[in-house]
Amino acid sequence: MLRRPAPALAPAARLLLAGLLCGGGVWAARVNKHKPWLEPTYHGIVTENDNTVLLDPPLIALDKDAPLRFAESFEVTVTKEGEICGFKIHGQNVPFDAVVVDKSTGEGVIRSKEKLDCELQKDYSFTIQAYDCGKGPDGTNVKKSHKATVHIQVNDVNEYAPVFKEKSYKATVIEGKQYDSILRVEAVDADCSPQFSQICSYEIITPDVPFTVDKDGYIKNTEKLNYGKEHQYKLTVTAYDCGKKRATEDVLVKISIKPTCTPGWQGWNNRIEYEPGTGALAVFPNIHLETCDEPVASVQATVELETSHIGKGCDRDTYSEKSLHRLCGAAAGTAELLPSPSGSLNWTMGLPTDNGHDSDQVFEFNGTQAVRIPDGVVSVSPKEPFTISVWMRHGPFGRKKETILCSSDKTDMNRHHYSLYVHGCRLIFLFRQDPSEEKKYRPAEFHWKLNQVCDEEWHHYVLNVEFPSVTLYVDGTSHEPFSVTEDYPLHPSKIETQLVVGACWQEFSGVENDNETEPVTVASAGGDLHMTQFFRGNLAGLTLRSGKLADKKVIDCLYTCKEGLDLQVLEDSGRGVQIQAHPSQLVLTLEGEDLGELDKAMQHISYLNSRQFPTPGIRRLKITSTIKCFNEATCISVPPVDGYVMVLQPEEPKISLSGVHHFARAASEFESSEGVFLFPELRIISTITREVEPEGDGAEDPTVQESLVSEEIVHDLDTCEVTVEGEELNHEQESLEVDMARLQQKGIEVSSSELGMTFTGVDTMASYEEVLHLLRYRNWHARSLLDRKFKLICSELNGRYISNEFKVEVNVIHTANPMEHANHMAAQPQFVHPEHRSFVDLSGHNLANPHPFAVVPSTATVVIVVCVSFLVFMIILGVFRIRAAHRRTMRDQDTGKENEMDWDDSALTITVNPMETYEDQHSSEEEEEEEEEEESEDGEEEDDITSAESESSEEEEGEQGDPQNATRQQQLEWDDSTLSY
């Protein structure tokens, strides 16, 4: 049977069928069964000022469920399987977010949520997961990828500049040395990266300095440094990091140059000025010992004050030797054999002495000079103890005997009774005993061998002789004789002795009697006398006291200096330091192990001069040191220190004497037992003149000058000398007297001569005032005396400071005898000598403390009354004539009136007192001054009579040629037939 074929389908139907078949297959394939996939590790970089992280590899999540490419255009809005919807970061405090950029491709980025700071945290690590969008429109069954690790590094930005660790740097280098590194400057950078946090270079900004700095900050010198050229360098240094950023603040570097380290004392001044009267002055206030870091076991330092050129070895009071003995407590009776030349003590007048009065009197003996001590100055008995004291400076002049003091026969035998002499470097004392019943050997010569005798330095020698014992003190230290020679006593004789200083006295006999020097002839009435064994050197303060030995306390007082070194160590300093002081106070020795404590002790050493008026000049200072080290092989040595103390010139006092210069006394007072006090109102003061700087800003103003201020001070006096001017004192009729009991209480001695009286001894100005107030002048023949003049001079420190010359003139008032003839007014005074001055100078005299009988004589009183009455009468007469002349109209009337006014003066007798005439002559200047004052006060009265006086004067001029007037003048002449002058 035949079948029929099926009919063909339309094209539209075919397309619909294919779509249905295909659509059913795709839907069947959209199942979300795969997880997204990420790389296991990511590395990222982010910059501080950016928020996007650059990852390697890029952040892309893959999903196998991704739709087909050709179907994407139909299903993009309805299909989610295979797309990536997000990323999730796991970790605490992770400042990053992961954001999907393209869901279909799974691309994403990581961004920072906040500003990153590399300095706080340089890198971060965390995990991240990707998740897809799930399936279906609701996004169910979301798949997550595995956790991938992300490492992010924060890149640095050069935001911080280098900063130096120190605000400044200091270093000390020794001159002349080349250093590889002196010091290191170091800067830091707060940036976190190696590029920006590292310092790549340093630079010295200061130009032209001999230093350089490397990249690590080490500074070194480019040449050897010189302390003399520059003590310190100041450098400015900057730093750069590796990003070429410069430090905002540069740093200052101070490099001090230290002299080449030499062990020694440092911090002392070469010159120290000492102001008199300021007490102790520290001489090394900042001294310290530099040991250059060498280990030292102990240090011994000796400080010495050199004063050998001042006075007799140092500064001492420069009073006379007798006054010094008294001040030191020595008993009275000291005889000064080499006194300062004065009126009564003049045997040293021809000896050369030192210049000036800053030091006491020093006598020079050149081998040809000597002085004989006058008889009666001192006597020595061999049976009594005695003391010889002397300052001596002697050099090594040879082997000849040189005599200091010698007592020998005046004539004939040339025997030496006692003698102190030098022989080489030996001091020898010869003391021969007087004749005695026992003729046996006895000690006669005592020998001392001393370096002090010939070292050309001043030394103090005291010889205490109490036979047979003789003790010698040199500078306060006792010395026993190394040899004693015995001899027989002297033979009996009645020959007088002669005491000589600087040689020995002997009569020339042709044989030199054990003398090794050529004798020098001295002219004498007794024959050819000679000096021998002359001394060459300097002597001062030679004294001899008989009857008592010198105490050790007195000897030390005489030798002790008024200046020296002092060390006052505080309780908290100077521990462990041993201190030794020399008795002379000129040497101090310090020893210790602790250098710090030794330095403190040295800083407290001071110079002190206790004199009110010290001797100005230089006192040299010297420090010598001895170092003991643990290792003697490398022990250091310390050079000596040389400096000086400059004692400034003290303000010189001006001693002023004031009082009554002129006065008169009756002759009876001069002849009385009390006499007349010469200085009843004497005043002694002393002043110094100081410069006072202006106050405020006056020192800056050149127009303001310093003012001088005079201040009164108090000090002692040692001499007051009263001398008579004109003829010397005649002790047979006049004398100067003083209360000796008061003098002994004051400790002031007095000596008198024909020239006057001298008071000596150290005492206050008030004491000298009191003593001089009691000085009296007596004259037993005052009726033949008109006046006497005296001069007073006081001084201090043996003539260093001298007062003004205070002169006093005393006049004698002579009183007439009332028992003479009644007409004594006309008699010639008996006390006026015609060959002498006929007047007594009373001008300017003050009648101090007048007595009832010291008045004008009665004769003179009558004469004065008569003269004054006559003068008043003549004045009244003159005034009357002037007024009458003014009223005259005719010459006849005038003549008549003149005749009426004539008076009979034939019986008038006038006696003139010579004393009054002399007073009038010398007081004319004072009267003229008084008249001028009266004329100025009475000017109006004078004006009233001026015209009358002028008319009267014209008329008187016209009357000069009138014979009648001549007759009248003859009538008015004085009757001086009985006038006495």
From Swiss-Prot:
Positions annotated as glycosylated: 346, 366, 515
Signal peptide: 1-28
Cytoplasmic side, ranges: 881-981
Compositionally biased tracts (Acidic residues): 925-960
Domain Cadherin, chain residue ranges per copy: 38-164, 165-265
Superkingdom of origin: Eukaryota
Amino acid composition bias (Polar residues), ranges on this chain: 962-981
Role description: Postsynaptic adhesion molecule that binds to presynaptic neurexins to mediate both excitatory and inhibitory synapse formation. Promotes synapse development by acting as a cell adhesion molecule at the postsynaptic membrane, which associates with neurexin-alpha at the presynaptic membrane. Also functions as a cargo in axonal anterograde transport by acting as a molecular adapter that promotes KLC1 association with vesicles.
Subunit structure: Directly interacts with APBA2. Forms a tripartite complex with APBA2 and APP. Interacts with KLC1.
Official protein name in the record: Calsyntenin-1
Origin species: Homo sapiens
Designated gene of the protein: CLSTN1
